[in-house]
Amino acid sequence: MVQFVFYKLNFASKEVLVAQETFCDRLRQTMSNRDVRQSDVIRASEMLGKKLGKSQMSQYVSGKTIPRRDVAELLARILEVDVTWLLAGDADQGEASSPRNDSKPEPHPSAQIARSTTMRTFSKSTKLDNVLYDVRGPVVDEAARMEDEGERILKLNIGNPAPFGFRTPDEVIKDMRQQLPDCEGYSNSRGLFSARKAIMQYSQIKGLPNVQMEHIYTGNGVSELIQLSMNALLDNGDEILIPSPDYPLWTACATLAGGHPVHYLCDEQADWYPDLEDMESKITSATKALVIINPNNPTGSVYPREVLEGIVEIARRHQLMIFADEIYDRLCMDGYEHVSIASLAPDLPCVTFSGLSKSHMIAGYRIGWMVLSGNQRCMSDFIMGVNMLSNMRLCSNVPAQSIVQTALGGHQSVNDYIRPGGRVYEQRNFVYEALNKIDGISVVKPRAAFYIFPKMDVKKFNITDDEQFALDLLHEKKILITRGGGFNWAEPDHFRIVYLPRMEVLKESLEDLADFFDHYRQA
């Protein structure tokens, strides 16, 4: 049965009950008839002195929501149609509607109640105005709409191994099954002793200094712990240095915590290593910390020791805390060795994040951790804040914690994937070579993780809007990717794809991608 969302609107002294499906159909029909894109509507709204965001427009077009009355009037004005027709279809497309005297049956009592009650609207918090998370954003919403209509979408937008046939090691599943009866209650808010002990030993092998059990925290994935640590550290207006491109959760969490994310550049011409000169130039008296993502998402770059030592020197000179996102540290290829930056900074406050989601192909289990190391005296108050927030969420997923010790010990099956002949290794090589064969596309070879971040010749393809490019690719080839802007990259010239699908699927998708770029020119 069709689900209808009703709003009360007063146009020309008439109450109109609006069907959500009707509105999005009318909007898409009008835009198609007038050959108008979403980006055209957004630009037109700016010319009229109004603000209409990409996410808003995408949700209206996909039928996820209906705009407020003032926004509906703005859309009608831009598209030169009658607002009542656009919303409810009661009037001619190009004419203002007038009241009708058609006799109608008496409405059901519940409808009378709905029309007589004016319910206030609830808007999202203004704290979300500058938050971006396009890994699951408007283009993904459009893909979901297409799937609902029966389209088959190839999802190359997210590093989720399980749907592509990567299986959890049998020993891990067996261990969780055996321990489930003992996992029914809360654990210590920091995590199970066995899990934290295994994490401490792993951290010591990585060379992290001054690691203590009480400064290890398990979480429902690294994502929860990033948000927790940002809330514990940042006051309103505090600045934190974050790479560009970045994993967008860092920028989002810093913003939600009241901080101001400042992006330093990673240099594509230097294997996507951080530009240390640019990093230091962005530091002000308000800068509190810096973030590195190593191995990097979305570029797959693995930072060498000398680059990390340079970052440590910058942090030391300016007395900054270091946050290191190292979730892909066990997925390095081509002989590249991961060096934990905390191992180079025993005198600095460091927070290191890792987990099992990627290395053990168990993203759905939601198990990550963070380790506070180095100079803990200067972050004692921060640690109190972390403890407070950790206690407030009670504890992380206990069954997932129970398998950390097993997962970190013994044979690491991930190594079979990333060596020559391994599935991840070979698929990475294929995608890298196939992309470089496409005229107008260039790409730096990723050395770790699941992602590749190609560059498009924007002049050749006439690309000015990378979200529109992602939508065009989705509509024509049914391929879902993430635009470069979703990773806080300023130019509309990059996109990220995941090389997790099986080889035969990747071959088909890269052929489709080559065919798309062979003729694509953004209008």
Segments predicted by a language model, with ranges:
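PLP-dependent enzyme catalytic core of the Aspartate aminotransferase-like
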Residues: 78, 205, 281, 462-464, ...
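A short, Lys/Arg-rich alpha-helix, primarily the initiator
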Residues: 1-45, 107
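Short, basic-rich loop-to-helix N-cap that marks the start of a DNA-contacting helix
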Residues: 62-77, 93
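Active-site phosphate-binding strand-loop segment of PLP-dependent enzymes
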Residues: 262, 267-337
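Conserved core segment of the aminotransferase class I/II
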Residues: 346-422, 432-434, 517
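N-terminal small-domain helix-loop-helix segment of the aminotransferase-like
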Residues: 120-221, 228, 395, 407-410, ...
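Conserved glycine-rich beta-strand-loop-beta hairpin in the small C-terminal domain of fold type I
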Residues: 405, 421-432, 443-457, 491
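Conserved PLP-anchoring active-site segment centered on the Schiff-base-forming lysine
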Residues: 232-254
